Amino acid sequence: MQTLNTLDLQTTSLKIVNGQLWILDQQALPQRQEWLLADTVASLIEHIQALRVRGAPLIGLSASLLLALLAERGLSQALLEQALIALRESRPTAVNLMNNLARMQQALLQPNWVTAMAAEALRLVDEDRELCERIAQHGAALVKPGSNLLTHCNTGGLATAGIGTAIGVLLRAHQQGNLRQVWVDETRPLLQGGRLTAWELGELGIPYQLICDSMAASLMAQGQVDAIWVGADRIAANGDVANKIGTYSLAVLAHYHRIPFYVAAPHTTHDPDCPDGAAIPIEQRAASEVTGVSGGFGHCQWAPEDAAVYNPAFDVTPAALISGWVLDSGVITPEQVAAGFFQPHR
């Protein structure tokens, strides 16, 4: 029987070697491709909070795999329960982590909990890969021939077990010959667009141009953006979406310029217990991310040492600004959302 120790995950950003979890350091990309050991709860939490491992689906998968590996290593049920609690608190906004850990907790309660946790973790990886493919197929059907699309942050294989969410849509649209090019927001303050999405699109052979976040409005006014595609970290019961900071700005601009604004996400990003965007916890991050820059390219500070900084990692886009929620189950329309599609009874 195949165990986690012998498994080839076939993901871009996670691997298991000799029963230990390794992550691709996404803070070092694109200058360096470095793998970091994440074999303890403390080390994985540190990597998550430092954004060395990031992306709502991938965070949940990394936590699930580590728990299963720790179970195989002989960690007691009581200690695994403590690990679950600690991992759950590592990043508050992305709901995939909470959903995955809830499933791992159910596996932990089984009589054969070691085997059950390994099976559940592998199931989560396989499911995420399949969900990405379904999202890509549904989304690509919305892309018209010759489209110039704009995307924000990073939503590809680096952030998932599969081809990604919004980037998966771009990939399939490109393969179908309908994509002219992608405008890539650099995504301040941590430059996930400039560092990760630009690198990923280049690896996939998808034509793109990198822009500063503040250039998006000008491009829309010139008619050079046909649609905007973003991912999501949490979808509330009323359809509001939490995503990387700057997403809301794009949605407002798209609404003004009458450009379709699509959210691509798996159903695991939906939180039926969260009534609306106001109830979504928004992570606040360090001032140093705004006063300067660091990563694989070195460190530079441009703001005064004592500059006051406001640095939320996410913002909330109201459902009224979204043209469609592209899930693994299909494209959800504003009319369906208004009728209660995301409400708990569903």
UniProtKB/Swiss-Prot annotation:
Its EC number is 5.3.1.23. GO terms for biological process: L-methionine salvage from methylthioadenosine. Pathway: Amino-acid biosynthesis; L-methionine biosynthesis via salvage pathway; L-methionine from S-methyl-5-thio-alpha-D-ribose 1-phosphate: step 1/6. Keywords: Amino-acid biosynthesis, Isomerase, Methionine biosynthesis. InterPro entries: IF-2B-related, IF-M1Pi, IF_2B-like_C, Initiation_fac_2B_a/b/d, M1Pi_N, NagB/RpiA_transferase-like. GO terms for molecular function: S-methyl-5-thioribose-1-phosphate isomerase activity. It catalyses: 5-(methylsulfanyl)-alpha-D-ribose 1-phosphate = 5-(methylsulfanyl)-D-ribulose 1-phosphate. The keyword Lipid biosynthesis does not apply. Catalyzes the interconversion of methylthioribose-1-phosphate (MTR-1-P) into methylthioribulose-1-phosphate (MTRu-1-P). PANTHER family: METHYLTHIORIBOSE-1-PHOSPHATE ISOMERASE. This is Methylthioribose-1-phosphate isomerase.
